[in-house]
Amino acid sequence: MKTLTIGDLKARIPIIQGGMGVGISLSGLASAVANEGGIGVISAAGLGLLYKKLSPNYTEAGNLGLAAEIRKAREKAKGIIGVNVMVALSDFAELVKTSIAEKVDIIFSGAGLPLDLPSFLKKDSVTTVSYTHLRAHETCADLV
């Protein structure tokens, strides 16, 4: 199989695990995929529901939960860890900022146009991928 290269990141196994929410793509799955050589992805969607004990405020609980999941994945994994943040989420900006602060390797954004995403990034801070279904299918076809 070909190595998957996205920016400076190189995944030995050309697999990007889907960021499936709510509560499916968390640190356990993402770290397992990363340890096998693929890109493990944590879904940022709905974490406020799973981490409601951390804060009564849904947005705050979601951001605290995302930070916790990224840290757990980092503890378990030696490979590439990313986050999937849907642009359509009302707390998109906060989730992106949390992902950057926690030093994820890559942010995937879909479900809208992430027009303000570049404003959150510093040079060489994190790789970002914006995707649509068509672009994702084209990328997969190129790998095969």
Give short role names for the model-derived ranges.
Residues 1-104, 113-115:
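N-terminal capping/small domains of soluble enzymes
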Residues 14, 19, 127, 136-138:
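Proline-centered helix-kink/hinge sites
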Residues 40-43, 108, 126-131:
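Short hydrophobic/aromatic-enriched beta-strand-loop microsegments
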Residues 60-62, 127, 143:
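Short alpha-helix boundary/capping motifs
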Residues 65-68, 128-134:
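A general structural signal for short secondary-structure boundary/capping elements
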Residues 78-83, 121-130:
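Short beta-strand/loop segments at the ligand-binding rim of alpha/beta enzyme cores
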Residues 109-124:
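Active-site-adjacent beta->alpha loops and helix N-cap segments on the catalytic face
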Residues 133-136, 140-144:
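Single conserved hydrophobic/aromatic residue that forms the stacking wall/gate
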